[in-house]
Amino acid sequence: MRVVSSLFLPVLLAEVWLVSSFNLSSHSPEAPIRLVSQDYENQTWEEYEWADPRDDNEYWLRASQQLSNETSSFGFSLLRKISMRHDGNVIFSPFGLSVAMVNLMLGAKGETKVQVENGLNLQALSQAGPLILPALFKRVKETFSSNKKLGLTQGSFAFIHKDFEIKKTYFNLSTMYFDTEYVPTNFRNSSQARGLMNHYINKETEGKIPKLFDEINPETKLILVDYILFKGKWLTPFDPIFTEADTFHLDKYKAVKVPMMYREGNFASTFDKKFRCHILKLPYQGNATMLVVLMEKSGDHLALEDYLTTDLVEMWLQDMKTRKMEVFFPKFKLNQRYEMHELLKQVGIRRIFSTSADLSELSAVARNLQVSKVVQQSVLEVDERGTEVVSGTVSEITAYCMPPVIKVDRPFHFIIYEEMSQMLLFLGRVVNPTVL
């Protein structure tokens, strides 16, 4: 088994596909991106040169905290939607999906834009200004980028059909706030387009996702891809010498053998008496943390998801105590792909996927333009050195004498977040660590 050099790697890719019924004139594959100048637009971004609405650092701190809370709530809601479709392993990024949708929202107007804001739980924040959401995400991304120990790399590609005209304002805003790299693409030649896009994504994810695209609709006009590469190293690694094959109980009747890591040391943890679950913190270098939620009894993990909220997680964190413990934790790898557009419809984001979509801030030929797909793929690897991956009910929590051993040998949930911003980076569950 190959050992990944930097341990825990979530790789996240969020694709957004825009499809039009127009047949536009042909240009050479090398043709530059066609921008419609502002001089010829009916410009509605009056505050295009918009700066921070306030210079008050306290305001930005409060707004960033609210952004993190709402992104977490959005993530927990999506987890419940995913669980309605299947009960297996899960890994996705609420942060990555929110970034992709807010990037796209720069091109939306009217009810189309409002539905995206509401679906992401960001309608209250957006009232501060037309570009407050992109500005907030930009600040968060810059904070991550400046923290080299965090090991988080992000980026955005826009594969745009060679003769599709986008508004200069959208081009500039998406570049300014999301560092979007635009790549001219001939979607009429689907095999060429597929090869080009897979080449870019394979390179940026360091080979973790070599073939993201299979089939390409020749009517596609724009594909947005946001990616996150997280190479988290445990603050205190597990020693591979102590890793041994052990039993992981899938349920009361089935079990599998997995490589089980072991470490003795000081761990922050607590126990929720109401939900009967252990909560364990596994810190990374660079102020990131994996929170492991392990039910006391095997088979109860799905029931917990109905009650997961930002308030509940905050209570867990506040109640944690650091103790000397023995921890057993399985090595595993996850690779999950989700048709997020179907899930987004369930949280009220529907118009952007219909013929009623208003994307007139994105293109002057926005009539008949709609989003056909939002796809997210995440890869997560966890081993001894770390990770390498491409509002609620108050519960009674009672401090108690933690058992000397926590053995994660049954299905569990994990929450990966950045400590300073409290931003939820990845969320998921492991039901069977031997299955991708």
Curated annotation (Swiss-Prot):
One of its GO terms (cellular component) is extracellular space. Phosphorylated by FAM20C in the extracellular medium. Expressed by the liver and secreted in plasma. The keyword Nucleus does not apply. The keyword Secreted applies. Residues 128-145 are annotated as: Heparin-binding. This is Protein Z-dependent protease inhibitor. The lineage of its organism: Eukaryota, Metazoa, Chordata, Craniata, Vertebrata.
